[in-house]
């Protein structure tokens, strides 16, 4: 692994003039900063948001060529409808996510975290792939280290539900998805690349929406003491979206929570090509969306 000298920030973004980027979950937190900075660099940016009103409020504070379109990753019909509205796109940033929420199901019957964080983005990426010219960046987390994929019980029907383990599973799935996507793109002879990023420990609205009366106040207090800004947390995503990288790069702060931005390691489970392939095939069956190239 090599490190960019100094501390890379969004100020180092190259020009995105003439390019189109989609950022999911762009109405707040890391997604908002990612969209704003890409627009500042000259990109045409589509803010893909479940709540259009919040998306429009975020858009009002941005300059450049930006627009909001509805996308609910917990509803595959919404994912398909969104994909149908998209023309050519250069960069897709799979940023949206939920964290450690109480047990609930998506509209399609998936456990909400694996459904939103992984399966929704899996379907979106494959539906858009014929229209993507450059790369796909998926936001994972250090919490992938706590994750384990249960291919027989992805939706926590047989296991006692654990909000944090379910979150870790979904973030591990993001990395396995990225690796298998990169492999399939290369095998298809595509010039499109796939990368992942993690923000370190950034204070965002995710920690305030766990739905846990004990956990939420704890994380909000931790944010004030230890959390970096969303501006800092978006830097790995922006790096992954803009730099010349080997396929399947994983970008984050060097020291985990903080540090210079560059390639970082991942857990042994996240490096399993066998599990990545099995998860991909299961995801195709569950979403009824296949690799299109």
How would you name each of these model-derived features?
Residues 1-210, 288-293:
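Rossmann-fold NAD(P)H-dependent dehydrogenase/reductase core
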């Amino acid at each position: 692994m090599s490190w960019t000298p100094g501390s890379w920030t969004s100020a180092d973004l190259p020009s995105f003039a003439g390019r189109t980027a989609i950022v999911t979950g762009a109405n707040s937190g890391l997604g908002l900063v990612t969209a704003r900075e890409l627009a500042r660099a000259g990109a045409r940016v589509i803010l893909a948001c479940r709540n259009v009103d919040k998306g429009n409020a975020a858009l009002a504070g941005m300059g450049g060529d930006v627009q909001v379109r509805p996308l609910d990753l917990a509803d595959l019909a919404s994912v398909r409808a969104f994909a149908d509205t998209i023309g050519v796109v250069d960069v897709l940033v799979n940023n949206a996510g939920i964290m450690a929420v109480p047990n609930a199901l998506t509209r399609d019957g998936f456990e909400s975290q694996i459904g939103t964080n992984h399966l929704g983005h899996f379907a979106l990426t494959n539906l858009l792939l014929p229209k993507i010219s450059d790369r796909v960046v998926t936001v994972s987390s250090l919490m992938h280290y706590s994750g384990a994929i249960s291919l027989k019980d992805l939706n926590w029907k047989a296991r006692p539900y654990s909000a944090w383990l379910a979150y870790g599973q979904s973030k591990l799935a993001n990395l396995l998805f990225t690796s298998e996507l990169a492999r399939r793109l290369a095998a298809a002879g595509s010039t499109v690349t796939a990368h992942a990023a993690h923000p370190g420990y950034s204070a965002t609205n995710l920690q305030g929406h766990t739905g846990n009366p004990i956990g939420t106040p704890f994380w909000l207090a931790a944010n004030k003491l230890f959390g970096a800004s969303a501006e800092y947390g978006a830097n790995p995503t922006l790096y992954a979206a803009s730099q010349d990288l080997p396929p399947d790069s994983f970008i984050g702060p060097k020291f985990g929570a903080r540090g210079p931005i560059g390639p970082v390691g991942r857990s042994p489970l996240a490096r399993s090509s066998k599990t990545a392939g099995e998860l991909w095939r299961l995801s195709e069956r569950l979403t009824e969306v296949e690799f299109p190239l």
